């Protein structure tokens, strides 16, 4: 899929996380237990993680950040699709002077 610029579907997330061509894992399952497991496995394989499953960060964020640092990778968060976050983004954009055409 990487070579051809296409999409790869699999049910074996461990194989995907351990693949040598994967640099970053974006975890967005919405399942905090699975998300923590996915992040820890990614760190074990030297992969950075962008955590979209905010419940996992609320549950184990400091531990995940520590494990990422120990593995020499990055643990980062991403805004999800929660309405309050969208409102914050709209406020930020307007404050910066950007016209908001849809939200």
Predicted regions and their residues:
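N-terminal glycine-/serine-/threonine-rich beta1-alpha1-beta2 phosphate-ribose binding loop
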Residues: 1-45
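A short helix-to-beta-strand connector/capping loop
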Residues: 2-8, 71-73, 98
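Structural detector of well-ordered beta-strand residues that form the stable sheet scaffold
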Residues: 10, 50-51, 76, 101
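Rossmann-fold NAD(P)-binding glycine/threonine-rich loop
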Residues: 29, 33-45, 52-81, 86-92
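Active-site-lining helix/loop region of Rossmann-like oxidoreductase modules
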Residues: 91-103
């Amino acid at each position: 899929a990487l070579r051809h610029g296409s999409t790869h579907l699999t049910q074996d997330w461990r194989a995907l996380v351990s693949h040598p061509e994967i640099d970053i894992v974006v975890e967005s399952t919405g399942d905090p237990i699975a998300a923590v497991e996915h992040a820890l496995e990614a760190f074990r394989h030297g992969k950075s993680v962008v955590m979209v499953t905010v419940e996992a960060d609320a549950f184990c964020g400091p531990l995940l950040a520590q494990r990422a640092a120990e593995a020499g990778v990055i643990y980062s968060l991403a805004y999800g699709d929660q309405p309050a976050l969208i409102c914050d983004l709209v406020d930020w954009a307007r404050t910066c002077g950007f016209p908001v055409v849809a939200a």
